[in-house]
From Swiss-Prot:
Propeptide residue range(s): 21-44
Domain comment quoted from the record: The presence of a 'disulfide through disulfide knot' structurally defines this protein as a knottin.
Sorted UniProt keywords: Disulfide bond, Knottin, Secreted, Signal, Toxin
Organism: Lycosa singoriensis
InterPro entries given in the database record: Spider_toxin_CSTX_knottin, Spider_toxin_CSTX_Knottin_CS
Stated name of the protein: U3-lycotoxin-Ls1g
Amino acid sequence: MKFVLLFGVFLVTLFSYSSAEMLDDFDQADEDELLSLIEKEEARAKECTPRFYDCSHDRHSCCRSELFKDVCTCFYPEGGDNEVCTCQRPKHLKYMEKAADKAKKFGGKIKKWFG
């Protein structure tokens, strides 16, 4: 009985050590992958089209606002036959960003009061 108990403790210790080593390897791989994704995102962010600028050359190139990506909206100006496309923020997303900003400010006040 003592041998079985000792053998069980040895197996649990060996398993926990090996799983900790594997988790460290996975964490390192995830960290390297995350760094490469951040570098790609920074490179891509420099090429975005600002709000109210022409986006007809690439309709998916609009810049991000604080929370959401702007949308390339196309329309025909009054009295014109040519289609005009510009990066714009839809109104519902504008209101959602304002609400999120107010919630952040309110959360900061609560943290200040009780923190």
